[in-house]
UniProtKB/Swiss-Prot annotation:
Protein localization: Cytoplasm
Organism: Nocardia farcinica (strain IFM 10152)
Gene3D superfamilies referenced in this protein's UniProt entry, alphabetically: 3.40.50.880
Entry protein name: Phosphoribosylformylglycinamidine synthase subunit PurQ
Catalytic activity line of the entry: N(2)-formyl-N(1)-(5-phospho-beta-D-ribosyl)glycinamide + L-glutamine + ATP + H2O = 2-formamido-N(1)-(5-O-phospho-beta-D-ribosyl)acetamidine + L-glutamate + ADP + phosphate + H(+); L-glutamine + H2O = L-glutamate + NH4(+)
Keyword Disulfide bond found: no
SUPFAM superfamilies, per database record: Class I glutamine amidotransferase-like (SSF52317)
Gene Ontology MF term list: ATP binding; glutaminase activity; phosphoribosylformylglycinamidine synthase activity
GO biological process: 'de novo' IMP biosynthetic process
Gene: purQ
The protein's Enzyme Commission number: 6.3.5.3, 3.5.1.2
Length: 225
């Protein structure tokens, strides 16, 4: 039986369909999860996709964090379930306390939409084992509030524990502290990143297929769990 990976849809989510397709391309069963669901339908992992959940009112991810399904995601993550937050999903995971820090308005206050080179800094997470350390991958970036910020002590802790998972290569597109594009939880099971790997799973339709590695990695994690 193939792994079951849930993909959450909030009001305002845009990239759930692409995440579902990425899951299927990797060879897993995609399970649609609605924001009001009170259970996770026996999934093995969860993806919180990008978009503008609840219109980004208050601040990005602030309302989605209180959706019924997120209560279940937090409980499951605390028990070791792999969770991936992409763009708005990363913001939601930070708001939910599963990842430290916050995502704020881009430096320069412009929405950014471009293909972005990333450096894979950690391959020790549930979502990055298929990559080589230091690999350069090309992934679309599209966000207005993608500037990662945290207290200096938190940044030092992330660096010291190897929890910076992705870093922007070359110029820093949004002013994120230390060029951070993605981080993980202490156990490596929860990962959040601003760029969109689900838009880079097929060379025909994306800038590359470099993003597929995240979805393949979690399948490896689930098989060996």
């Amino acid at each position: 039986m193939s792994a079951r990976i849930g993909v959450i849809t909030f009001p305002g989510t845009l990239d759930d369909v692409d995440a579902v397709r990425a899951v299927r391309l990797a060879g897993a069963e995609a399970v649609n999860l609605w924001h009001a669901d009170a259970d996770l339908k026996q999934v093995d992992a969860v993806i919180v996709p990008g978009g503008f959940s609840y219109g980004d009112y208050l601040r990005a991810g602030a309302i989605a964090r209180f959706a019924p399904v997120m209560g279940e995601v937090v409980r499951a993550a605390e028990q070791g379930m792999p969770v991936l937050g992409i763009c708005n999903g990363f913001q939601v995971l930070c708001e939910a306390g599963l990842l430290p820090g916050a995502l704020t308005r881009n430096e320069g206050l412009h929405f950014i939409c471009r293909d972005q080179w990333l450096t894979v800094e950690s391959v020790s997470t549930a979502w990055t084992s298929r990559y080589e350390p230091g690999a350069q991958i090309l992934i679309p970036l599209k966000s207005g509030e993608g500037r990662y910020q945290a207290a200096p002590a938190v940044l030092d802790e992330l660096e010291g524990e190897g929890r910076v998972v992705f870093r922007y290569s070359g110029d820093n597109p949004n002013g994120s502290q230390r060029g951070i594009a993605g981080i993980s939880s202490a156990n490596g099971r929860v990962v959040g990143l601003m760029p969109h790997p689900e838009h880079a799973t097929e060379a025909l339709t994306g800038p590359s297929d470099d993003g597929l590695g995240l979805f393949l990695s979690v399948l490896d994690t689930l098989v060996t769990a």
